[in-house]
């Protein structure tokens, strides 16, 4: 499997605190069936503005240590980009890493309030020949309230990543997105070896129960590998299923009064 979202680069954000902590994460990754991950350290002006070169340098150090220990694992550089109106400029001037030097960029949205400029931003990102991926879409309050919020962006060609762990913490929304074919990638969003670790064995089983082995392979292997190979991934907008209609209650009539 390939992880598309993690904070394995040490000493730069709220993720791993040391090289050895990162190596413990690699051990957990391997025990869970992963062989590759994209390091998506934060770029967020309110918290962490991790330098793109530092991500690359520390990824290289970690990969050298991985090889030294004869582990079958590789780390690729990336960024988790908190959206702002001038995100495209920051990408173009080299302040932000694309995922594994591909056409794909991972975007983090505000958690509580909608980014009113998001549609324009996605359009402008696409004008640059890039493909936006919305990180942990299930965690945003407005997506929990209305998963259809994502439909316009998927129709534009944006892709959706959800966290394995959210099948527990945001179960209803995650299940809805998975069942309706609105997800393109699974990610651990792993931060450390114990707190928010890459250990997703239980979550993996639950997700497979929902979408089946074949679809799980697409979200955890096929599509992530296409990022690494810089291959096109369609949004599959026409494959999205209608929302299930809520069961009506005998009391609904009186509620409308």
Locate each region found by the language model.
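Extended substrate/RNA-proximal surfaces in nucleic-acid metabolism proteins
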Residues: 49-161, 239-257
């Amino acid at each position: 499997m390939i992880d598309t979202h993690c904070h394995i680069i040490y000493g730069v954000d709220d993720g791993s605190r040391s090289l050895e902590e990162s190596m413990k994460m690699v051990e957990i990754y391997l025990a869970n069936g992963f062989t590759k991950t994209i390091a998506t350290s934060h770029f967020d002006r309110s918290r962490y503005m991790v330098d793109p070169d530092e991500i690359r340098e520390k990824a290289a150090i970690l990969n050298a240590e991985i090889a030294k220990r004869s582990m079958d694992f590789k780390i690729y550089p990336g960024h988790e980009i908190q959206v702002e109106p001038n995100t495209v400029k920051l990408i173009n001037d080299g302040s932000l890493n694309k995922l594994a030097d591909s056409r794909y960029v991972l975007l983090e949205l505000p958690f509580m309030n909608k980014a009113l400029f998001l549609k324009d931003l996605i359009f402008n990102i696409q004008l640059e020949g890039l493909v936006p991926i919305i990180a942990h879409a299930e965690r945003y309050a407005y997506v929990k309230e209305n998963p259809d919020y994502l439909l316009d962006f998927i129709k534009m060609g944006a892709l959706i990543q959800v966290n394995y762990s959210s099948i527990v913490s945001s179960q209803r929304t995650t299940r809805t997105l998975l069942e309706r074919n609105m997800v393109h990638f699974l990610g651990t969003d792993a931060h450390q070896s114990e707190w928010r670790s890459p250990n997703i064995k239980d979550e993996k089983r639950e997700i497979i129960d929902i979408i089946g082995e074949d679809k799980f392979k697409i979200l955890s292997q096929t599509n992530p590998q296409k990022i690494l190979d810089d291959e096109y991934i369609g949004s599959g907008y026409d494959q999205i299923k209608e929302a299930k209609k809520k069961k009506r209650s005998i009391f609904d009539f009186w509620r409308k009064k």
